[in-house]
């Protein structure tokens, strides 16, 4: 019931697992049997569907690894990119990179094979790492929204220091590690007998108490509220107030108008990141909630395929974020180009910003120093 993982195999009935394992015409012993009813066939066992799933997962992995690695690289390499907001964005990229490397390959393997082939240790570690990475992403997006809200709406002159930002990032990982710990603790690596003399290996959740323990449902619902509903509420409130503030704010002077445009672009970029995350994860969260409320959802003919499709949609957020940074933010776009050209300084591609303009800008800023200074600086990424 964690945020990601192939739960379809863990909740199937014996009859469903039989159909998946042996296909339409043979038993484990190679005996011919009558064709099963069409509605019992699992679509994820069809070669055409498997090819599509492999292409989809591999594309997401490739785009996610390249994009998120590039975000991390430019923040580390270029000193001008080492701002508090960019540290949070880089932390988001680290979490997404972990999802690309720890979630997708194992989930795809589990989906295609129909049983757990990675051993007992990874049975406990993989779901934990998956939950940890997703929760860090959610908390980081919330932190970014609160940081922008603090600086822009309240005009606070005291900015968060880099040391404090690292402390916040550490807390995000610590809280996520604690919240994801049940995914590693309440796990069972076991053999399940499908028919006499035939068993498969399964990696399933094992909560204390009776077979259908309420603890699993409570954990799943709590995760939905704490790591999806509540963050989305906070993020939506923060960005609504930011949008209202930017809409009503008027900056004097040409230089401040330039910064006002940058503020708007930055806010749009961050809002798009949040919207992409929310929309991409909504189908999977809603589907898992439906399973918790009504277990008959597990009896759907295409439960496994539906789960896999929603999982793919959720994973698209891991490569969408770097695309948003590159497309909507000029700083990242220039940093990406500079990284591809193997340039050592980001300033080398700031050709449109002349020394004369910089001097003029500094002079205007000094003349217009006042309450708006903190407002201007706070919105630059």
Swiss-Prot record:
Cellular component, GO annotation: cilium; glutamatergic synapse; non-motile cilium; plasma membrane; presynapse
Q: Where is this region: Disordered?
A: 1-35
UniProt membrane topology term: Multi-pass membrane protein
Q: Name one GO biological process term.
A: positive regulation of cell-substrate adhesion
Q: Does the keyword Disulfide bond apply?
A: yes
Highest rank taxon of the organism: Eukaryota
Q: In which tissues is it expressed?
A: High levels in amygdala, corpus callosum, hippocampus and subthalamic nucleus. Also detectable in caudate nucleus, hypothalamus and substantia nigra.
Q: Which residues lie on this side of the membrane: Extracellular?
A: 1-51, 108-124, 187-216, 290-304
Q: Which Pfam families match?
A: 7tm_1
| Disulfide cross-links | 123-203
- Residues with glycosylation annotation: 11
Location within or outside the cell: Cell membrane
Question: Which keywords are on file for this protein?
Answer: Cell membrane, Disulfide bond, G-protein coupled receptor, Glycoprotein, Lipoprotein, Membrane, Palmitate, Receptor, Transducer, Transmembrane, Transmembrane helix
State the family it belongs to: Belongs to the G-protein coupled receptor 1 family.
Q: What does this protein do?
A: Receptor for neuropeptide Y and peptide YY.
**Designated name of the protein:** Neuropeptide Y receptor type 2
Q: Which organism is it from?
A: Homo sapiens
At the highest ranks, the source species' classification is: Eukaryota, Metazoa, Chordata, Craniata, Vertebrata
Quote the gene name from the UniProt entry. NPY2R
């Amino acid at each position: 019931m964690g945020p990601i993982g192939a739960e379809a195999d863990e909740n199937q009935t014996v009859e469903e697992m039989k159909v998946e394992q042996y296909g339409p015409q043979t038993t484990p012993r190679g005996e011919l049997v009558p064709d099963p009813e069409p509605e019992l066939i699992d679509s994820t066992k069809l070669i055409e569907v498997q090819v599509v799933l492999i292409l989809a997962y591999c594309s997401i992995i490739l785009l996610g690894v390249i994009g998120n690695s590039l975000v991390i690289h430019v923040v580390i390499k270029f000193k001008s990119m080492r701002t508090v907001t960019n540290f949070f964005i880089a932390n988001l990229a680290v979490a997404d990179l972990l999802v690309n490397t720890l979630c997708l390959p194992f989930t795809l393997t589990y989906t295609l094979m129909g049983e757990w082939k990675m051993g007992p240790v990874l049975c406990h570690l993989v779901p934990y790492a998956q939950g940890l990475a997703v929760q860090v992403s959610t908390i980081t997006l919330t932190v970014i929204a609160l940081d922008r809200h603090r600086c822009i709406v309240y005009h606070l002159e005291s900015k968060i220091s880099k040391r404090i930002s690292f402390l916040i990032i550490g807390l995000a990982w610590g809280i996520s590690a604690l919240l994801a710990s049940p995914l590693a603790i309440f796990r069972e690596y076991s053999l399940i007998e499908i028919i006499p003399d035939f068993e498969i290996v399964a990696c399933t959740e094992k909560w204390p108490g009776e077979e259908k323990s309420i603890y699993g449902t409570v954990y799943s619902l709590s995760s939905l509220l704490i790591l999806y509903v509540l963050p989305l509420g906070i993020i939506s409130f923060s960005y609504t107030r930011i949008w209202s503030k930017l809409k009503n704010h008027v900056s004097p002077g040409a230089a401040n108008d330039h910064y006002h445009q940058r503020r708007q672009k930055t806010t749009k970029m961050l809002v798009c990141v949040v919207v992409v995350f929310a929309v991409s994860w909504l189908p999977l969260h809603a589907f898992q909630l439906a399973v918790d409320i009504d277990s008959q959802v597990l009896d759907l003919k295409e439960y496994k395929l539906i789960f896999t499709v929603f999982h793919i949609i959720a994973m698209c957020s891991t490569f969408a974020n770097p695309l948003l940074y590159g497309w909507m933010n000029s700083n990242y776009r220039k940093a990406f180009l500079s990284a591809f050209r193997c340039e050592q300084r980001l300033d080398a591609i700031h050709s449109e910003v002349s020394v004369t303009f910089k001097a003029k800008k500094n002079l205007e800023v000094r003349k217009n120093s006042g309450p708006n200074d903190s407002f201007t600086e706070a919105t630059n990424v």
